[in-house]
Amino acid sequence: MVAITDYCGIVSGNKTDKSKLFDVFYGELKSAPLINVCPLNIECKPSQTVDLPTNTLFIGEIVNIYLEEKYLENGKPDVKKIRPFLLTMPDNRFWAVGEQVGNAWKDGVKFRETIP
């Protein structure tokens, strides 16, 4: 998921339909695609927009959470099973729980080369 996630951060949604890269489903709101291969999907509705000097911050209210039972331990989400990753800056690296799993603005470039 790292390479395709990075690719989605590299290309503009105005020029590329990113939803075609994934098998998607729609949740309770029926308004935004959720990704089947993601172990965890959090469906949100917009609640606030904050204009920042160089970006816009969108804040959402959680409507529903989608998580398969295989990612639970004693009825609770198990982060080691889910294996979420995040982007840190300014080093531009993706990290999983306790380990780096990719490099931002590099792995997506490699993935882009595989798109016809």
Locations of regions flagged by a protein language model:
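Basic, polyanion-binding surface patches
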Residues: M1-P116
